[in-house]
Amino acid sequence: MTRSLKKNPFVANHLLRKIEKLNKKAEKEIIVTWSRASTIIPTMIGHTIAIHNGREHLPIYITDRMVGHKLGEFAPTLNFRGHAKNDNKSRR
């Protein structure tokens, strides 16, 4: 279910402050965050945000097509390596 339109999109306060500070200085640097639930807003476009996936921070460059999505959607947490091979020799 989607978020109510009466409410504003969720963006962590510390992340919003960092982005606004960089926009005032007109600088681009990697912003490290653990806030995967934050929604991408238009002021984030052009910044590189390192999103935590549970083990490391993955740097993601924010484009205009990502607006409205959550940061966590772009940093996968699971690494599926495929199903186990069918080992018939060990069954004998």
Swiss-Prot record:
It comes from Spinacia oleracea. S19 alpha and beta forms differ in pI. S19 beta form is the minor least basic form. Component of the chloroplast small ribosomal subunit (SSU). Mature 70S chloroplast ribosomes of higher plants consist of a small (30S) and a large (50S) subunit. The 30S small subunit contains 1 molecule of ribosomal RNA (16S rRNA) and 24 different proteins. The 50S large subunit contains 3 rRNA molecules (23S, 5S and 4.5S rRNA) and 33 different proteins. uS19c binds directly to 16S ribosomal RNA. Component of the chloroplast ribosome (chloro-ribosome), a dedicated translation machinery responsible for the synthesis of chloroplast genome-encoded proteins, including proteins of the transcription and translation machinery and components of the photosynthetic apparatus. The gene is rps19. Gene3D superfamilies: 30s Ribosomal Protein S19, Chain A. One of its GO terms (cellular component) is mitochondrial small ribosomal subunit. Keywords: Chloroplast, Plastid, Ribonucleoprotein, Ribosomal protein, RNA-binding, rRNA-binding. GO terms for molecular function: rRNA binding; structural constituent of ribosome. This is Small ribosomal subunit protein uS19c. PANTHER family: RIBOSOMAL PROTEIN S19P FAMILY MEMBER, SMALL RIBOSOMAL SUBUNIT PROTEIN US19M. The keyword Ribosomal protein applies. It is found in: Plastid, Chloroplast. One of its GO terms (biological process) is ribosomal small subunit assembly. Belongs to the universal ribosomal protein uS19 family. Its main location: plastid. The keyword Membrane does not apply.
